[in-house]
Regions:
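Residue-level marker of structural boundaries
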Residues: 25, 104-108, 189
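Residue-level detector of flexible, active-site-proximal loop/helix-junction positions
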Residues: 33-35, 62-64, 155-157, 184-190
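A structural signal for short, well-ordered beta-strand segments and their strand-loop junctions
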Residues: 5-7, 27-30, 56-59, 87-91, ...
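PAPS-dependent sulfotransferase catalytic core
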Residues: 1-54, 190
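Residues within well-ordered alpha-helical secondary structure of globular protein domains
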Residues: 22, 166-170, 186
């Protein structure tokens, strides 16, 4: 089985990508067209198209379009999805949470996938919020265009097994709620909140 996971940033896409890879035994291809990340980490930069193993999962973000794709008439994901058996769209309805997460990590410049607390907001960055909003609008547009339902972060990471089961049912992938829950349990979320005490 080949799965394409298209997501917005800070939506739990890495956790879901690793979960499906582990549960289904799939080869991982993580953000192959994220050129900035790959150059910084000095990792393999793939040219499109590249051969995929038969059982694999590819995680990509909506803005990651390969440099080799030049068509103005064909949407890149419309073309690429033909190489996959399943396509999952992942987004988050709370754009403020995405903004705060991205804003925090852009300031501290540490690894994205770690626990953190965002307690003191930095100066508001209008261009960052616009970028997040545009990505959100794109995935909603693409969902409507392709007839692929969006899996919402708020459902998948809710801790509610009924909501998680509905996500799995939409994917039409044979995995159990309990297996997936081990990964999407909200107690494992990256962002931590300071408990307020009443005086």
């Amino acid at each position: 089985m080949k799965i394409l996971l298209i997501a917005n940033a800070r939506t739990g896409s890495t956790v879901l990508y690793k979960a499906l890879s582990d549960i289904l035994g799939l080869k991982r291809y993580g953000e192959p067209f994220n050129y900035g990340m790959r150059k910084k980490a000095n990792t393999l930069i793939r040219k499109y198209p590249f051969p995929l193993q038969h059982n694999c999962i590819v995680k990509t973000l909506t803005r990651h379009i390969p440099e080799e794709f030049k068509s103005d008439e064909i949407n890149f994901y419309d073309e690429w999805k033909r190489d996959f058996d399943k396509v999952i769209l992942l987004a988050r309805e709370n754009l403020q949470d995405i903004y705060e997460s991205q804003d925090f990590f852009r300031h501290i410049k540490q690894h994205w996938h770690q626990k953190y607390k965002y307690e003191t907001p930095y100066t508001f960055r209008r261009e960052l919020y616009k970028f997040i909003n545009d990505s959100y609008d794109y995935i909603k547009w693409y969902s409507k265009k392709s007839h692929i339902p969006i899996t919402w972060y708020e459902d998948l990471y809710s801790g509610d097994k009924e909501k998680i089961k509905k996500c799995i049912d939409n994917w039409e992938i044979d995995i159990s709620v309990d297996d997936l829950y081990n990964y999407v349990n909200p107690e494992k979320r990256y962002r931590q909140f300071t408990k307020q005490t009443l005086i």
